[in-house]
């Protein structure tokens, strides 16, 4: 189950499509893709 926007994460693979894990805050942020 993937994490949605601003969901807690430890790596980008934790996040849903088009999201990446912020290394600074450890939550999922938009990666700029559609």
Curated annotation (Swiss-Prot):
Q: Does the keyword Secreted apply?
A: yes
| Statement: the UniProt record of this protein carries the keyword Transferase | no
Which keywords appear in this protein's UniProt record, sorted alphabetically? Disulfide bond, Ion channel impairing toxin, Knottin, Neurotoxin, Secreted, Toxin, Voltage-gated sodium channel impairing toxin
- Which tissues and organs express this gene's product? Expressed by the venom gland.
Protein's cellular compartments: Secreted
Coiled coil regions in record: none
Gene Ontology molecular function, alphabetical: ion channel inhibitor activity; sodium channel regulator activity; toxin activity
Q: Which cysteines are joined by disulfide bonds?
A: 2-16, 9-21, 15-28
Q: Give the comment on domains.
A: The presence of a 'disulfide through disulfide knot' structurally defines this protein as a knottin.
Protein name from the UniProt record: Beta/mu-theraphotoxin-Pe1b
Query: Which organism is the protein's source?
Result: Phormingochilus everetti (Malaysian purple earth tiger tarantula)
Taxonomic lineage is: Eukaryota, Metazoa, Ecdysozoa, Arthropoda, Chelicerata
């Amino acid at each position: 189950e993937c994490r949605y926007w601003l969901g807690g994460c430890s790596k980008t693979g934790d996040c849903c499509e088009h999201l990446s894990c912020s290394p600074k805050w450890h939550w999922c942020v938009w990666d700029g893709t559609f």
